[in-house]
Amino acid sequence: IVAEPRNASVKRKDGKFVVIKEKTGYTLNMNETFANFKKAVEAEKHQFELDVVKKKAKYTSKDMAEIKDVLGTYTTEYGGSPYGRKVNVANGASKINGSIVYPGETLSVYKTVSPFTKENGYALAGSYENGQTVQTYGGGICQVSTTLYNAVIRAELKIVERFPHSMTVHYVPRSADAAIAGTHKDMKFKNTFDTPIYIEGKANGSTITFTVYGKKKDPKRTVEFLSETTQVKESSESTVSDNTLAEGQKVLESYGHTGY
């Protein structure tokens, strides 16, 4: 008898939205039900009525039918990536694809795409760690969060959390990236609109695209973002003593990186 209500939903099929109807929930009014039971016992009756209360879904089919406008979209290229990285970009996009964010809700990219394991569809590929590139499961997932970030800011949604990479990335202009790493770097955004939004993610082996759908308040409004470098910091040389090397021997651990 007890069942939680389910909000209406949508899915994309053949380039169109299909609305999935909401479901009414049910719960028992325990006080009234117990009172009915007590009366039945006192009257030596074998039956009594359950006081069932309906719980309506918060968002109905009418609300979901409002999702039809493109609020923001963005595409990045990854066709030249190694096989493992391509696998990770496509896998990450598929996990975010179809996400519905209701008004007031916050979507965490890290929670949506993790864990970064072989069992969860990820492969080994390069990722940034302590100023170096190392092989990890899920390497390249930051291109997924970055592409979504750029679609989200064009939809003018609120960014709750966003971090830049420790080094520059090639697939977006400087300052347009959004890194995720463990639980200490995430990309989160909040639906500050009064209608639900739908996230579509597509990866075809060459490009990844995220599109945010919802209800556009002003069809004539457009937004544009510019990347401007205000300061350049050249790298410096750092020498570390290593007793395992022969006297006078030097080994290059890593190249320096220009900061911006």
Describe the residue ranges of each PLM region.
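Well-ordered beta-sheet/strand-loop patches within structured domains
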Residues: 1-260
